[in-house]
Amino acid sequence: MDIQLKKGILELVILKFLSSRDYYGYELNKDINEILQLNESTVYALLKKLIEKNLCIQYIKNSDNGPSRKYYQITTLGMQHLKNLEQE
């Protein structure tokens, strides 16, 4: 499979998950791995690129069960991009 096509599909999958709610990194990786077998570093690398493109943001939230967690949230631009990807 073409590498750019793969990246586009993975970007779509991550944005689709984030469109339903905010996720912290480990939780997102775990849920994605239920349908796709991905290396954990792949998900984090794509999240970083999505942040750089302003398609999602990262924020820190305190946890009742341990240390603070980094959460990811889709932006308005990310929602528009997701709609475009779904139409292709």
Which residues make up each language-model segment?
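A generic structural signal for short beta-strands and their flanking turns/coil linkers
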Residues: 8-11, 52, 68-70
